[in-house]
Amino acid sequence: MMKKRLLIILAGILFAGSFAFQPVHASKIVESDREVNQLDEAGSLAKYHDNNINGKNIKIAILDTGIDTTNRDLAFKKAINFTSADSADFTDRNGHGTKIAGIIGARKNGEGLIGIAPNSELYIAKVANDSGKVAFAEVIKGLNWAVQQKVDIINISLEFGKGNEALKEAIDNAVEHDIIVVASAGNIRAEGDTFKAYPGAYPDVISVGMLNVHGQIYADEFKEKKVDVYAPGEDLTSAYFDNKMTLDTGVSYATAYASGYAALVMEDRLSRDESISRDSLLKTMKADLNQGINGTPWYVYTGLILNILTFCAVIGLGIYSILSYRKSITRKWPLRTMGISIAIIIAVNAVVRYLVFLISK
């Protein structure tokens, strides 16, 4: 009878151990001989990629620090440099622009990173120097150049702390040419940082906030900024120098994700002869990418249930052992049983948590 009760208690512990805790994700250099797909927590990317929608014929201008021209995963249609007199020196020596280009359009070539829109056409405008410094004048030149190239989307993973009339005019000009401008809502530099970032804060720009790996808003400060859509920005795989990849976190990368995703929606709409506007595009992006931002993360519920069930199991085991102790002749077996059971509880929880961690990475 005692053994039967013990089995029932252990079954309860196993059930409790099947729930999860919040995993921890660390940034690192990634090297792989196989293709690496981008984060797709909501399954939104798969619905396009599985139907061979990869951004074909969609032109995306990237205004950043240039591009690594030797990276095997990256290709571009045109490129130009606005940071010096040599317009042909668009080589990225900073790394930021290469990462943005990789997230948006890394090619599907059987190895390395696959971008959000791997068949899109990239137009590179180097508007930030090798130290990452950027001025209004260079961004304005980049915007005007992108308009001349008749691109469909302009990605600006850069930000200014204030607006500029000439910058706004360049943005307005791009919008008037039916170009979708996607820009960062601004990094969170400290707790309580809710300052608006430009050009993302302009009304006609799609301003992007950041989601964590679970599809939740990364920081509450984003709720106080001008954000039109949230996109994944934690632990995104990026292209880097020497054909390496990195895991990176930041709203810059969320912006790139959003630009690539916009290209997928565009291709899908064009294939069905549907019209494209900023509002209709934004509506689809929000429906696809922001499914879970108002809900409670799954690990909150499962972690709570795990704690409650484990607590109840331990209390039940303790009561059972006390009652058995009083009835026992030797008064040793119940204590030994309780000790073994507690050890099993700890072991089961540790194993299940580790398995969930591996699955959740």
Regions inferred by a protein language model and the residue ranges of each:
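Substrate-binding/access-modulating region of protease and related hydrolase catalytic domains
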Residues: 127-202, 243-255, 298, 303
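Active-site core segment of subtilase-fold serine proteases
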Residues: 28-121, 141, 214
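C-terminal subdomain of the subtilisin-like protease fold in secreted/lumenal serine endopeptidases
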Residues: 152-156, 165-166, 177, 204-207, ...
